[in-house]
Amino acid sequence: SLDRRQSTFRLSFTDFSKKAINNYRLKNGKKNIEKYKELFQIAKSKYGVPPEVITAFWAMETDFGAVQGDIHTLSALATLAHDCRRPEMFQPEYIAAINLFSKGIIDLKTTGAWAGEVGQVQMLPSDILKFGKDGDNDGFIDLKKSPEDAILTAAALISELGWEPNQPWIEEVIIDDKNFPWKEAGFGRDRKISSWKKLGIISRNKKFMASDNTKATLLLPQGLKGPKFLAYSNYNIYLKWNDSFIYTVTAAHLASRFSGQKKFLSNKPDKILSLEKMIKLQNILQSNGYNVGKVDGILGRQTRQSVRSIQIKLGLPADSWPTDDLLNILN
């Protein structure tokens, strides 16, 4: 939805996840897992996707169908396909939406998100066309009104994105070593569990969810003072669903909470820089030859990467998290 794409970008991980992982979602998620137990079992045996993973997306996207967006799907996509800066992205979605209309899956009154996502798990028309399932066996695919259709369709899509059955996705870890090599964290620097253990990483569960040979990536969504996670290859499916770092770690942690894991340790992370300071930081990095992408005050992947590089250059703990202290040094 518009809200998930835009307003999440300015929040820190702890602030965003406090809002996203609330009591309403935790309580109703568990209730829904119980209520649709048989269907979740079918989804798991057919597609290998756990109920907790589907339910977390269902919660994050629409609060279990409560907030599905009120923008007319066909007219939104018609506009985006013709007037937008990325017609090559939206034209196929508009054609797919017309196909859905001809099949009776959506109609002229169908509403959803600004970019054409529809239904309780907010899927694009092309994905609904490919993966739409009739979960309640009433002869129709209705992702807006039928939770059963939404659950089974989400399972089919998540499976197609590459979900590995019976494998973990994320787990919280503890790092007590003050001299830990923080530059080893982040995307593209995965190593075996045995190697992380040697560096002093401990699972919050006491025992790691995967074997010593399994590769995982250390994620620090809010720097070395914030919560820490090891992400397994199934975490990549979250990034294919939504490429926001903060959204994906939150959705993965929410799925873990439904599986009985504890709330992450908040610790006392440094606050996120204000918009003004973030823009200042990006300008300084850019003028020093670092590629931050767009100077927009948003801590995206390229800005994090640039922060890490300059931290290494300055001999600081390289956790990719920009702080007031870093900005003062650069000033």
Model-derived features with residue positions:
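Residues within the helices of the helix-turn-helix
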Residues: 41, 279, 283
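Generic hydrophobic alpha-helical scaffold/packing signal
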Residues: 252-255, 282, 308
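Short acidic, glycine/serine/threonine-rich helix-capping segments at coil-helix boundaries
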Residues: 271-278, 286-330
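Catalytic glycan-binding domains that act on GlcNAc-containing polysaccharides
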Residues: 1-215, 226-230, 235-250, 254-255, ...
